[in-house]
Amino acid sequence: MNIISKKETFYNYIHLWYHLSINKNELFESQGNIKTYREEIIMMLTKRIQNIKPAATLALTGKVAELRKQGIDVIAFNLGEPDFGTPQNICDAAKAAIDAQKTKYTVVSGIMDLKEAICAKFLKDNNVVYKPNEICIGTGAKQPLVNAVLALCEEGDEVIIPTPCWVSYIEMVKLSGATPVLVQNREEDGFALNVEGIKKAITPKTKAIMINTPNNPTGAVYTKEQLTELAELACKHDFYIIS
């Protein structure tokens, strides 16, 4: 009975964890018994999960929806979504795949035809050679990034993250047990990659750096010279570039 009770408590109140993290003061004031639920949930979660903060972008999504429901015209900058629908050729291909019963398990690392197409793209557009066994397919960007961080980083490691950054980077690193080390890209420099700041942040504990270009959210495009210098630093100090 104790196990069932804990499961019921978890499933009934886990949604409160998110809301408490976003606006806990309001909830504590409005419902006197919320604290009990929150404490029960905390006891069930590991320390690494307790360390993770909900994405601010998703919290704003709820706020935007609420304002729009009130008839307020809102421009949302929190999510990187295009202002147009999925192109028809993509919709048609997805439907055709379903109709062809392509709905079963694939090879864990991804469909071979897709991996071969990616290798061809890299050779044509980037002049680099990859083999299909060096390619893994993920569901979107977040899953393979989390996989990479969890595979490479652990407690005692440091991961450099140039900021402003995608909010999920910091939480991914914390989830692995490693420590995020933030290096500010300056607005007065057009948010260019702060290579000098990265140099100062490197320590014997540095395991990786997480970057993307164009940067999310600033849109800054790092130059070939900056990226070459970063690659040289990675080789010199033996850390990974996760991008």
Identify the meaning behind each predicted range.
Residues 70, 176, 236-237:
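Helix C-cap/helix->beta junction micro-motif
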Residues 186-243:
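Active-site phosphate-binding strand-loop segment of PLP-dependent enzymes
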Residues 14, 18-42:
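Short, Lys/Arg-enriched N-terminal segments with co-localized hydrophobic residues
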Residues 175-181:
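A short helix-loop-beta submotif of the ANL/AMP-binding
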Residues 151-173:
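Conserved PLP-anchoring active-site segment centered on the Schiff-base-forming lysine
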